[in-house]
Amino acid sequence: MTTTAYDTHFMASDIAFTVNRTEVTLNIPFRKVKRLGDIVFGMAGCLFCMRDFSEALIDFILQNKTQFELPRSILEKTNSDFIALIYLSGSCLKVSKMVNDTEFTIENITNVPTVIGSGSFHTQHIIHDCPNAIAVVLEAIKYDQYTAGEVKYCS
């Protein structure tokens, strides 16, 4: 992972990821990665959507709500996808709202092998050998350590 900038307590990064379990491939880079205590989450989507998602997640955590509601700005967005990965207590969840969908989905991708790198969509032959590299990177961010050789870069 390469950290490229800091702005308003976000860490901008160039993470992209590929999942090869049900042929779900997402080759869009994270635009923002944020740490909130033991929770780390990365997002890709419009800037305002990422801001709204961050605020909704913080409200959900701080107020101990039982149900998470995706912000209206994301649900009503029709010209771009929104994806967030949330890492907490060793689990990696993917929240996504794609352009043509009317609902958002939450998936547990902790056990899905993943590869990180700008060229990850070219690496189908080695994905089965990789651990969940997303979780590795998010765990590293949680402790302010960046990869330490654990992530297989494929670009």
Predicted regions and their residues:
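Short, flexible beta-strand-to-coil junctions
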Residues: 7-8, 86-91, 143, 155
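Short polybasic amphipathic segments
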Residues: 82-85, 95, 151
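C-terminal binding/interaction regions
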Residues: 136-155
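Conserved short S/T/G-enriched processing/targeting/catalytic segments and their helical context
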Residues: 1-82, 89, 98, 104-134
